[in-house]
Amino acid sequence: MAKKYFGTDGIRGAVNSKNINGDMFFKFGLATGTYFKTQKKKKQIAIIAKDTRLSGYSLEPALVSGLTSAGMHVYTLGPLPTNGLAMLTKSMKANMGIMITASHNPYHDNGLKLFGPDGLKLSNKIEKKIETLIDQKIEKSLSKPKKLGRVKRLETANKDYIKILKNNLPKDFNLRGLRIVIDCANGAGYKAGPELLKSLGAKVFSIGINPNGLNINKNCGSTFPNKIRLAVKRYKAHIGISLDGDADRIIMCDEKGIVIDGDQIIAAIAMRWKRKKMLKGGVVGTLMSNYGLEKFFKLHNIKFLRSNVGDRFVKEKMQKNNFNLGGEQSGHIILGKFATTGDGLLVALEVLFSLRKGKKASSFFNTFNKTPQILENIDVKDKNIIKNIDIKNSIKLAEKLIKGQGRILVRSSGTESKIRVMGESDNIKLLQKCLKIVLRKIK
């Protein structure tokens, strides 16, 4: 049975719409609190972090109210990268962690990402159980007055997160001599990002660090890489780091101003880990990973598997196959040895490990030639139109025409009202012809 509230990465939508409003966030809090209370712990604890959206100020109190009404004690952490929340959920031995964010989306959207006590995103099975609790009568979940939860603010969350990141580094690790540009997307990483790099001795040029509630991801961050590209050239930096709104994605830029996507970052890290005998099993990508990446790994005898789109599915396939590296072209990259979910700053440190020894970013990222890829995102009112027989037939025809020379992938977004149509081939004319066949049926 399809889920009612949860998508591919938590719950997301327009603020004050059907699911993203104070009333629903109270219900989400009450339902998740009720579910996690079943764990046999002496103290029932939930921790909440958020990005910098204006709507966070109205949604967070509603969520807290629901959790405390279920008898959960709550720590609010303020703006913090998503993986910072995942790490602190585990280190604080909390029952759960909840991130209020809509990731790379504009300010007018918001949502929730939920983590269990192990720092992992919730499984489909648990999400369905929570959905059942959301829809039941409220009286069944309310705690008695003397069993209501309490709320505390944790002011040290960003420092605690940075400390955990640095604990993974050698004691003598430093970035002295490196000039680094970081774009924090006016989002959750605006404090931790620059502070981490400066504490390691780098000369840091920070942009996207002045959030006003409305400018998160606006012409900045990982979905707008031109900003970091221009900044790297302006400041003559060795490398550029571009995060998204909740800092779980990273796109980079080398010293020449060339933008490096998630596939290229994964390839470079995989090769370094293989040389150091750190790579375990192989690498997990997604349906959207470039075909050139697949060919590159085959050439270097590295096993490569594809999962559905979404870093949760990447992590699940990594766990199932005992791999320790995986990620998405969009910049969600999971370093399984150190983290349970994507973390832009953690990935940046892994890359900077090589640069601090004098290697140029352009050399580090010189791995594979990408197969030309065209991606179209079409806004639609109903994502189910993808099941239309005419659209299905157009996809079959396009796949037949391009077979052996590339691939066509058509999928609905799990977080937005969009249909994504992607094609890859070295034969550009054929690729454009095949995409046109599909697009004219959808549009």
From Swiss-Prot:
GO biological process, one term: UDP-N-acetylglucosamine biosynthetic process
Gene Ontology terms, MF aspect: magnesium ion binding; phosphoglucosamine mutase activity; phosphomannomutase activity
Catalytic activity reported: alpha-D-glucosamine 1-phosphate = D-glucosamine 6-phosphate
A Gene Ontology cellular-component term: cytosol
Phosphoserine PTM positions: S103
NCBIfam families for the chain: glmM (TIGR01455), PRK10887.1 (NF008139)
Identification of the protein by name: Phosphoglucosamine mutase
Originating species: Pelagibacter ubique (strain HTCC1062)
Lineage: Bacteria, Pseudomonadati, Pseudomonadota, Alphaproteobacteria, Candidatus Pelagibacterales
